[in-house]
Amino acid sequence: MDKHRNYYFLEMNTRLQVEHPVTEECTGVDLVRDMITVAAGNPLPYKQDDIEFSGAAIECRIYAEDPENNFIPSPGVITVREAPEGRNLRLDSAAYAGFEVSLHYDPMIAKLCCWGRTRASAISNMARALREYKILGIKTTIPFHQRVLTVSYTHLTLPTKA
């Protein structure tokens, strides 16, 4: 903002981020509900100072892609879908057994989010959820996420620079 109170932006995303479940899990705030509330002309029922962060959350985007083949799209029909269940787990998905994944649209078929009191417990919860998540008939990024959640990742020893 300049001295005349004019706003300038280099970039602005006026949409809800794909990763919003991470924020929601760590704050208990329902961002979708609140966006609708504000869009309807109503005030938020809380102030910024009312929001407290608790724990850690991790989100894995599950795509109909083949991680063993440069993440090429994997269209087709989901023949089996067994979703993970339990505490501290959130699965946002419309996919089901019999669902056809098209080559013509975004191949994301689910967002899996796990919360824990600590980063380590969030990672443990995610590892369990990924083990329980079964999707057959197409290739998915589930095995890729399972490989990422290794000792190197959980102990922060992965290289982060090329």
What are these regions (language model features)?
Residues 157-162:
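A short, hydrophobic C-terminal helix/tail in secreted or cell-surface proteins
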Residues 1-156:
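ATP-dependent carboxylate activation and anion-phosphoryl transfer catalytic cores
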